[in-house]
């Protein structure tokens, strides 16, 4: 499968769920909670219970998991980070009208990391407008509007998730992980023309940016971004107790086999497998792996 779940720590689960359901065509399909003992086993947090809600649109198989921990710090993972720092970056969505979205959400009090910018995405033969909004908990949401046919019909502001992006220290290592180990299909890998996406991603002039994409039909693209400018790892910040994307999850039919292959390839298991209940899947076994550029990647198997 592709990205089965995107895990987002939130400071106010009700407000966050309302935002995604109202503006991004998600529906709440399940919810649940973890007691303190479970949170310690699953998330390595002491003395903190948690509640979660599972959101999903009608066209994709990826779930957005919102989870609120009692002992969250209130600190946003990318609040003080540079956009070229290594770790999960944003969730991208189709947009019907970027300028209208920018005006309307600004009026609602939301801030923009970058206002809509037009560029020609030759790798998909598309003219696009792209801007990045800070959504709930300052989570970056990239809005991508197609300006050239085929233009999808979108009711409301936003459509499907297009990708979940991460900034990578070592592109070859990341390609090995998602391609060779996980067997995902690489559909794009190239260096962007200088300056093309600089206004969107806010990197210094003269930065060379390489982009790679892994596509699994029915799921958001795994988007990998490598910049020539050196960044800093967000490993110590991109933790469950801080707000934002802290993990992506993949379903497997053989958890032990997957963990063995990851470990033998240099991607260590950082949280051993635990059997637990998770709606809407029922009973599962899950474990964490230290993925490319120290990102948390969860693998789980339904039982």
Residue ranges and their predicted role:
Residues 2-11, 51-71, 77-105, 128-134, ...:
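Vicinal oxygen chelate
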Residues 20, 24, 28, 66, ...:
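A compositionally biased, intrinsically disordered/low-complexity signal enriched
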Residues 27-29, 36, 62-64, 73-75, ...:
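Short loop/beta submotifs within extracellular cysteine-rich repeat domains
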């Amino acid at each position: 499968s592709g990205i089965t779940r995107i895990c987002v720590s939130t400071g106010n689960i009700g407000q966050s769920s309302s935002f995604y359901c109202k503006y991004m065509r998600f529906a709440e399909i399940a919810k649940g909670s973890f007691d303190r003992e479970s949170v310690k086993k699953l998330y390595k947090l002491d003395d903190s219970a948690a509640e979660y809600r599972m959101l999903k649109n009608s066209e994709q198989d990826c779930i957005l998991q919102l989870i609120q921990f009692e002992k969250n710090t209130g600190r946003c993972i990318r609040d003080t980070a540079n956009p070229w720092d290594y770790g999960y970056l944003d969730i991208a969505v189709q947009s019907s009208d970027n300028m209208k979205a920018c005006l309307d959400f600004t009026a609602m009090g939301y801030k923009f990391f970058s206002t809509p910018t037009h560029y020609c995405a030759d790798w998909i033969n598309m003219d696009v407008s792209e801007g990045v909004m800070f959504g709930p908990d300052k989570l970056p949401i990239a809005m991508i509007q197609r300006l050239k046919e085929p233009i999808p019909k979108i009711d409301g502001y936003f459509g499907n998730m297009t990708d979940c992006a991460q900034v990578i220290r070592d592109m070859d290592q990341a390609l090995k992980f998602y391609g060779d180990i996980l067997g995902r299909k690489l559909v794009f890998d190239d260096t962007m023309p200088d300056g093309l996406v600089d206004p969107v991603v806010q990197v210094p002039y003269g930065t060379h940016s390489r982009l790679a994409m892994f596509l699994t039909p029915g799921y958001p693209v795994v988007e990998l971004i490598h910049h020539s400018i050196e960044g800093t790892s967000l490993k110590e910040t991109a933790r469950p107790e801080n707000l934002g994307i802290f993990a992506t999850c993949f379903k497997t039919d053989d958890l032990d086999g997957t963990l063995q292959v990851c470990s033998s390839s240099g991607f260590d298991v950082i949280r051993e497998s635990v059997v637990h209940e998770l709606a809407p899947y029922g009973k599962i076994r899950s474990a964490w792996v230290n993925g490319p550029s120290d990102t948390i990647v969860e693998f789980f198997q339904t039982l």
